[in-house]
UniProtKB/Swiss-Prot annotation:
Name this polypeptide is given: Nucleotide-binding protein DIP1313
The keyword Transmembrane helix belongs to this UniProt entry's keyword annotation: no
Binding, GTP: 73-76
Pfam families: PapZ_C, RapZ-like_N
UniProt keyword annotations, A-Z: ATP-binding, GTP-binding, Nucleotide-binding
Family membership noted in the UniProt record: Belongs to the RapZ-like family.
Amino-acid positions noted as binding ATP in the UniProt annotation, renumbered to this chain: 22-29
GO MF entries: ATP binding; GTP binding
Length: 299
């Protein structure tokens, strides 16, 4: 097979190539299937020396493939260095990939491996936890430089699909993307976030009997939360701050920003504030905004 790239045409770069990587058991294959359903050409664990050539072929204006995703995991020999070299080479060719890192907590990964009765690829003669921690150490540098980190610890397959779809909403138009997610501190703080906000300083609708059964997406709760002067001042200030931060994020090549808004249970205050914050951010030009309520259905 001839993998030589034509040199007489400019590469097609409207949609950047995507590299999906992360921890074994964190949902790499599931993410790949979602992208396939979205019309991406997805290939898994091809030798690193072929990745650049394949992406170049797809970048050719005459190629029928306009969206390509490469899934690469720790089973690739000398994984970390190889993948970093591939990313660097593609960037030098003007084909800088979007790197998506799939992550999950150790206890969740152990449960998933146990349920499937599988051993970890780096486990050797040790325990599952030993294999997972070895992989974390190898993958840490890739995670730190990833454009998007998706923590699948608390996501169902449907939640994961929604997260992938939301993160890729604006990619074709090269828009900066902001995901505003609400959560409850009692369920743990999200690890896949850039900016974390605590709105427990606001009056809690939970203690208003007639509001307790509702959620922050319901008008009675939303009206109650947003009627507070502190809520309005916070929203004004934070929206202004994020507008001011955007050029810096853009300069650093960070086009995917996650803002996490937390209250106690993730049902009322954080949901109402996240919805209103997203509404305001949608008024900002060239910004793609999505909302995710992580804990709204939890007890």
């Amino acid at each position: 097979m001839n993998l030589n790239m034509r040199t007489d045409v400019e590469p097609r770069t409207e949609i950047p190539p995507v590299v999906i990587t992360g921890l074994s058991g964190a949902g790499l294959s599931s993410a790949a299937r979602v992208l396939e359903d979205m019309g991406w050409y997805v290939t898994q664990n091809i030798p690193s020396q072929f990745v650049v050539q394949l992406v170049e072929l797809c970048a050719d204006p005459h190629s029928p493939v306009d969206k390509i995703a490469i899934v690469s995991d720790v089973r690739s020999k000398e994984f970390s260095g190889s993948l970093e070299e591939v990313i660097s080479e593609l960037s030098g060719l003007g084909l800088k990939p979007l790197v998506v890192f799939m992550d999950a907590r150790n206890d969740v990964l152990i449960k998933r491996f146990d349920n499937l009765r599988r051993t970890h690829p780096l486990q050797g003669s040790g325990t599952l936890l030993v294999g997972i921690e070895r992989e974390r150490e190898i993958m840490n540098q890739i995670k730190e430089s990833a454009d998007v980190v998706i923590d699948t610890s608390d996501l169902s397959i449907h939640d994961l699909r929604r997260s992938i779809e939301l993160n890729f909403n604006g990619i074709a138009n090269k828009l900066q993307h902001v995901t505003v997610q609400s959560f409850g501190f009692k369920h743990g703080s999200p690890r896949d976030t850039d900016l974390l906000i605590d709105v427990r300083f606001l009056p809690n609708p939970f203690w208003v009997p007639e509001l307790r059964p509702f959620r922050g997406t319901d008008k009675p709760v939303s009206d109650y939360v947003l009627a507070d002067e502190g809520a309005q001042k916070f929203l004004d200030n934070f929206t202004r701050m994020l507008r001011d931060m955007r050029p810096g994020f853009k300069h650093e090549g960070k086009n995917f920003i996650t803002v996490s808004v937390g209250c106690t249970g993730g049902h009322h205050r954080s949901v109402a504030i996240a919805e209103e914050l997203a509404r305001r951010l949608r008024e900002v030009p060239d910004l793609d905004v999505s909302v995710n309520h992580r804990d709204i259905a939890r007890n």
